[in-house]
Amino acid sequence: MKKIACIVAGLFVALTMAAQTKVTWSMELGLGMSTWMGKDAGDSSPLFNQKVGVGIDVPLSGLVSFQTGLYWASKGASIDVDYVGANTKNVVDMHVNQNYFEMPLLAAFHVGTAANFDMVFTAGPYLAYGVSGKRNIDIDDLTVSYNTFGESKIDGEIVSGLRRFDAGVMAGVALDFKRWTVGLDGEFGCCKLASNSKTRNLAFFFTAGYKF
């Protein structure tokens, strides 16, 4: 709860800043791929995922602005895991879906062009909190599904969930038109997804936004 409070407090500060200067609000949609990285990521494969939310651009000078907002971001990966059943042991494919509320805290650098748009380069940290998700394992004709975050009970055993809190670094580039933006964002997680694993999130999204 303390981590959620910190995220909400950060957004409140951004909104307070927005009330004191001329800002740009936008609705944004991103489509892309996510996977895991790190020593224990193994042969993880990417999944198609998306994010959607509200963005805020707060001008600091003619060339620099502060960008934040609140997004629903889906991440995850497909990975091979060992499954031990009653009479067998198999390597099976597990799809992990992780849904976060995510808040970026970015410095944006605006570069004018001869055309009718600006180039915008962004970089900075992000904070995220996992709110939902499922882990699905296909075993022959059977699908075993349990929660991504929080504990689950399978065959009488308690299975730990992934850590809810995530933070990392974002970087991106976008074309900024009068009413629209299009761009590419990369998100590189710095927090371990579980206490006994060194895997971290990795995601790339093509984004489009409408400014109002």
Residue ranges and their predicted role:
Residues 35-46, 75-100, 130-166, 170:
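Extracellular/periplasm-exposed beta-strand and loop segments of Gram-negative cell-envelope proteins
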Residues 28, 40-45, 115, 193-201:
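Solvent-exposed loop/turn segments connecting transmembrane beta-strands
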Residues 21-23, 46-50, 97-103, 117, ...:
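Residues that define the transmembrane beta-barrel architecture of outer-membrane proteins
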Residues 20-53:
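Short glycine/proline- and aromatic-enriched beta-strand/turn motifs that initiate or cap beta-hairpins
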Residues 20, 61-63, 73, 112-116, ...:
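Outer-membrane beta-barrel channels and translocator barrels
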Residues 27-33, 52-60, 70-72, 103-109, ...:
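Residues on the lipid-exposed face of transmembrane beta-strands in outer-membrane beta-barrel proteins
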Residues 74-81, 157-160, 164-212:
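Predominantly the C-terminal beta-signal and adjacent terminal strand-loop region
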Residues 1-28, 208-212:
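Bacterial Sec-dependent N-terminal signal peptides
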